[in-house]
Amino acid sequence: MNDKYRWLRVAAVLVVVWLGCLAMTHAVAVIAREGEKAPVTSQQAALIATAVFPAINAKNVCLDTPLRITFASGPIVGDGEIQVLDASNDIVVETINVSVRIRSKSIGGLPNFNYYPIIINDHVASIYLSHALAYNTTYYVKIEAGAFKDRSGNPFTGFTNAEAWRFKTKAAPPVAGAKELVVAADGTGDFASVQGAIDFVPPGNKTPTTIFIRQGTYNEIIFFTGKDNLTILGEDRQKTIIAYANNDRFNNNAGGNPFAPGAPLPGTVPARSGAVYRRGLFLAHRVTNLTIANLTLHNTTPQGGSQAEALILNGTPRARAIITNVDLYSFQDTLQINGQAFVQNCYIEGDVDFMWGTGPSFFENCELKALRNGAYFTQIRNPISNHGYVFKNCTFEGAPGITGNFLSRIAPARFPASEVVLIDCLLTDAVGAVGWRLDQVNQPASEAPNVHYWEYNSHDSAGRPVDMSQRLVIARHLKLPDDGKSIANYGDPKFVLGDDWTPLLAPIITTQPASVSVSIGQKVILSASVAAVPAPKYQWQKSGRNITGAAQSVYAIGSVDSRDAGSYRVVISNIAGKVTSRVAKLTVVSARRRTGIPRLP
């Protein structure tokens, strides 16, 4: 090869090497701005960010939004600071040192809640600020290099200037006294967190207010007090999820034990008195007329992680709380109710004393699942002045292989009154033959007169009576006709809950019937879901006229013909009120005729 071509070949190699080095030095990760694309440079070996939320230059951002970064690979927390600054004056409004894994903040006006400022799920790092931002303000985010790394230790190069990640918050809050507030994790609602919406409601609220939570997972601890007349309503029971790993080790109650000897009932003390548990996922303290419906509360504390309620209601004997169509997940102490509450159509699982408190509480049509052998479904500590926990038409079951559980336990020397009554309940093998437990196993009823462990018509899945022959000595088997009055009384929520209260919730439609287009001969199912107490009646209509026999939540047409086309809706009612669904249009499409000359074989 002559020298001229040798030089050209060397030059070409140098160009390729230079381009490769340039690519390594300036590998680009594209992060979407609102309405445009903007490159963010980082080294090829570095952890690459592919998206941020709120988007760059986003507007109308919720004040309570978490910040989220999506990476090309799974991140871990490194070292460094994250800052949020006011773009108008470059003042830092929040600084997070990522090496400090746990911080403290006020929630719902109560100080000293521990929380995780950064939560990583798969490729997404969510950053939680200690307080809400301000309305009508532009902010930018700075992140030091190395604050996040990939699992090989390669750093995220961060954001270092005011233009890299900036956004503007909503211009103004919702109208004062608004009767509905919308929470949406994607930022399309009035608030991005459930707590943010609750905080907006004024103390002593007298206006019935619905906080509607769209589908999504909300990683937050909820606490509020003095916020009355609230309905917390999820868009979808399984897909609207409030979750957090809060527990007694993470948020220990430094103010004392609410159940210490001589302590007042938990729902009677002010929140700032100190004797209020901070360990639950969702805590409502001293509120009245609270309804929680159509969502999931999941305390993600692992088994053995100490007491970890999914829901704590610290009310009074006049709290008038309604919990309906709610799934509750945890292990130890899943549900604690101190005060008046009606619980309907709920799923509750846990392993030790996973339903407990002072009551009075009435459970109807609930599924209760034990996750451990030989443990306890309940531990009820009601005062003599009110009833405890009553279960009607509920199922006591266990996870696969779980057996030998007690329906309840108590130590009468410490808590002399404990009332747990089962009416028409289904008991599986998860419940042991003894059924109940006292600290002193053979203690006679005469020595614990205020312990009421009573059952009527406990049966298995085939409807056969449960064998009561081995029940604890103190337990009582109610029978007809002798115990007819007691059976009737304990089957009535008004009797159990007291204060002359009959739980009522006018129907709230949670899933509307959907329009559909089908061909002749196909099957059609129209349906609607509601939260309501008592259970509602349904009447489907076509073109505004009642359809005979269409009186269920689902209306089915087995084989559609052209005459079925039209507008359908359902009227749903109970003694508390009536609601009419949106119109669902049924379009019937005729099979198309083939045209043209058929092909000959």
Task: Describe the residue ranges of each PLM region.
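Surface-exposed, flexible coil segments in extracellular/virion-facing regions
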Residues: 541-558
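Conserved Ig-like domain signature around the intradomain disulfide
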Residues: 536, 565-569
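A short beta-strand segment in extracellular, disulfide-stabilized domains
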Residues: 68, 522-530
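Sequence-level preference for short, compositionally simple segments enriched
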Residues: 172-505
